[in-house]
Amino acid sequence: MPTIEQLVRKGRQAKPKKSKTLALKGSPLRRGVCTRVYTTTPKKPNSALRKVARVRLSSGVEVTAYIPGEGHNLQEHSIVLVRGGRVKDLPGVRYHIVRGALDTQGVKDRKQGRSLYGAKKAK
């Protein structure tokens, strides 16, 4: 236990914050190539077929990324943009694919909340 005098001289050292998206290597986004596109089931109590992809990133790491929105055009060898952000009911999925960037098309017929899904404004 330090004395008050020692704390006045040195102070406490803050613990460094641990990143939750290590594979991005400090970048906000990373480009990658889909190695496998498939569906998986969420953990209890939810039930669905969630669309996910295994992606080999430009940093050399292979991660599982979620494909948001209804319907997608991704297949093996598609070039995608990956951002951080986990999916709570899919264990091990800590990344999202950015819709409307590179080979990923935006969500068709989306009217509200379009920004996250790469959907253009309807004329």
From Swiss-Prot:
GO terms for biological process: translation. SUPFAM superfamilies: Nucleic acid-binding proteins. Disulfide bonds: none annotated. Residues 1-21 are annotated as: Disordered. CDD domains: Ribosomal_S12 (cd03368). InterPro entries: NA-bd_OB-fold (IPR012340), Ribosomal_uS12 (IPR006032), Ribosomal_uS12_bac (IPR005679). GO terms for molecular function: rRNA binding; structural constituent of ribosome; tRNA binding. It comes from the Bacteria. It holds the Pfam family Ribosom_S12_S23. The keyword rRNA-binding applies. With S4 and S5 plays an important role in translational accuracy. Interacts with and stabilizes bases of the 16S rRNA that are involved in tRNA selection in the A site and with the mRNA backbone. Located at the interface of the 30S and 50S subunits, it traverses the body of the 30S subunit contacting proteins on the other side and probably holding the rRNA structure together. The combined cluster of proteins S8, S12 and S17 appears to hold together the shoulder and platform of the 30S subunit. Part of the 30S ribosomal subunit. Contacts proteins S8 and S17. May interact with IF1 in the 30S initiation complex. Belongs to the universal ribosomal protein uS12 family. This is Small ribosomal subunit protein uS12. It comes from Bifidobacterium adolescentis (strain ATCC 15703 / DSM 20083 / NCTC 11814 / E194a). The gene is rpsL.
